[in-house]
Amino acid sequence: MKLLRSYYLLCKPNVVYMMLICALVGMLLAEDSVSSITTIMVALLGIALCSGSAAAINQVIDRNADAAMTRTDQRPIPQGDLSALHASSFALVIGVLGALILYFYINTLTMILTLASLIGYAFIYTVYLKRATPQNIVIGGLAGAAPPLLGWSAISNTIDPYALLLVLIIFVWTPPHFWALAIYRKDEYAKESIPMLPVTHGVAFTKLQIVLYTIILFIVSVLPYIVLMSGFVYLISAITLSSLFMYYSIKLYFSDDDAVAMKTFNFSIYYIFLIFVALLCDHYLIQ
């Protein structure tokens, strides 16, 4: 039982769940009515397996850094519950399985986009960007922003502009989300020589960037209404949620308490979840 739990934790389940929610939103927005439940479940399974594979590869590559950081030292590999070889083999198996499911039961486009996201996160971000530039989150964030597009393409077999707009929302949301956490964990990142923005440019500069990105996010979040993708209910929700995010970011900017950074980080998770819920409610409940 402990071994199964170790493999489960290797996949970063909380991250995968959030990605699946975003993918599901893309699926449900791709059509005016709910598609085949079977198609949705199979697509989510394929995306989940590939996402879990990417997370496992990330933990294999980052195992030494994970062992040295309080936030990650309880992961299966640093704890000795899994070897790097076994974790790598597991990642390969579920990654291939997920890709095959998408190829044979969904469509080739979704498989290609999902594998591109896997490669972007597991290799381009983890191997290179994470330790190469303080803009690692900005550049690498595209891979993490892909789930709505994956879900949309699973239903429509197209790359739709509306799906790309959902990707843009997550892409702009990602830097303030992670930089808030990076402020709270800056000493650990510095110890491992990981060039997160608070380490390379200081906390004050990072706080300013968080404020600027939340302003940009405010603008981007209302675009679905402007392009007639959504209605008034979503607009009110987006304005309210984005205003709250800006409140937290401004509060963080003027605070010397790192705990405020963690509160900002936690709110950002609620933000992205609720704004997508608002999109769904507007799409299906308000006709």
Residue ranges of predicted features:
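Small-residue-rich segments of transmembrane alpha-helices in multi-pass membrane proteins
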Residues: 20-25, 75-78, 138-155, 204, ...
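Transmembrane alpha-helical segments that form the membrane-embedded catalytic/substrate-channel core
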Residues: 49-57, 119-126, 169-186, 218, ...
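Membrane-embedded alpha-helical segments that form the functional core of polytopic membrane enzymes
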Residues: 21-25, 29-63, 71, 99, ...
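Intramembrane alpha-helical segments
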Residues: 84-154
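Multi-pass membrane catalytic core of lipid/isoprenoid biosynthesis enzymes
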Residues: 71-112, 202-226
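Juxtamembrane boundary at the C-terminal end of a transmembrane helix
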Residues: 277-287
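Cytosolic, membrane-interface loops and tails of multi-pass inner-membrane proteins
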Residues: 61-82, 179-206
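Interfacial loop-to-transmembrane junctions
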Residues: 246-274
